[in-house]
Amino acid sequence: MIGLSSWTGRVALAQGGTVIPALTESGLLPPGRHAASMREIREIFVEQAPHADHRRRIFRAFELYSDMIRDILERGTFWVDGGFCSHKAAPPEDLDLAVLIDSSLPLTDKDHERLIPLFTLQGVQAGQPQVWANRVQPMGGLIDSFPVVAGIPEQEEYWDATWSKVKGPDGELVPGAVKGYLEVSW
């Protein structure tokens, strides 16, 4: 069950779990990386958010995506971002993910083959049937996902900076504006 504590301004699970901070007046997470559970994300960014039916479909794709990644990676972390992690007026197009992969995991060639289609691919050309696409996203475009080697500071800093940027309604970056994002680990 979800409980709202107005005196702290934070949303928390009544039966334990992590705490997702209250959103700012503009419907964004406050700056920083915030630990969250899948259950909390569903409650705050689907059930309590505008466009709940639309978001529910994206979240179902995220749940299946998470299961597929966890079938391959015994441990890891998602950094969850994008319009999905907000209460903006416009519905989110997808859910953005950086998937932090522990380089010490004993991944086989088959594991790598299974991972490739789970990430956003750009400049894709296929021989049969002959097709070309600027961008191919997993889960029918509902997930926009990128692999990150965990523990490589340059990669983690890049994605932290990218996920902290704020875009306006026109899709352009808002200079100087900073927001937060979520972290789900298993």
Question: What does each model-found stretch correspond to?
Answer:
Residues 97:
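Structural signature of FAD isoalloxazine-binding scaffolds in flavoprotein oxidoreductases
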Residues 2-81, 85-93, 101-186:
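Catalytic core of pol beta-like nucleotidyltransferases
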